[in-house]
Amino acid sequence: MKEQAIDSALILRKSFEHGEALSEIEISELLKESKLVEKLTRDYEDSPFFNIFRLICLSEIPFIEQLPYTQKIIDFISNNLAADEGFSYNGQGDCIVPCYNAMLLEAYTRLQMAKSNEAQNALDWIKRYQVFERNQRTSWRYGEICKHGGCMKATPCYIGIGKTVRALITYAKYIKNADSHVEQLIEQGIVYMLKHNMYQRLSNQ
């Protein structure tokens, strides 16, 4: 059976993770040759959820921010979904919820935009309002956060916590663990996830 060739986006990802230096020409060629990049940049929809999830996919590929298509997605999110206090799934400040805020923070970090106002607002939202324990009340003033399955009811949504911890770990790596508050939140999140066996997704433990 003939082995399938490795997509050039994966080659780019491995080189990036191993710290291998690549020239601008090499990066450009690897992006250009990638079937995955071609598929991800083939279509476009002028809608919040399309742009959110497309950016999340794109952000897994190093240097993808160089493409005009990626910049188009970033511009849509920055102009339409980045509220004053964090990322919102519809652009309204009262519709900031943990999972979407965290996913977009991580995507912006991977796209070398961790220091942007949009990413910093998302990070500040986590620092101020995310809870990592049961029976704690968030000081976030909008009720949307208790809809959609209950992001922060008596038992905070495990998806929101998991994505928030992942985003914080990605951000911490980018800034070389220079933010002690971020490190503290990561520790709190991991302790909570292990304590409640969240990695097993069991509701009876």
Regions from the PLM with identified roles:
Residues 1-205:
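Preference for long, amphipathic alpha-helical scaffolds in soluble/luminal domains
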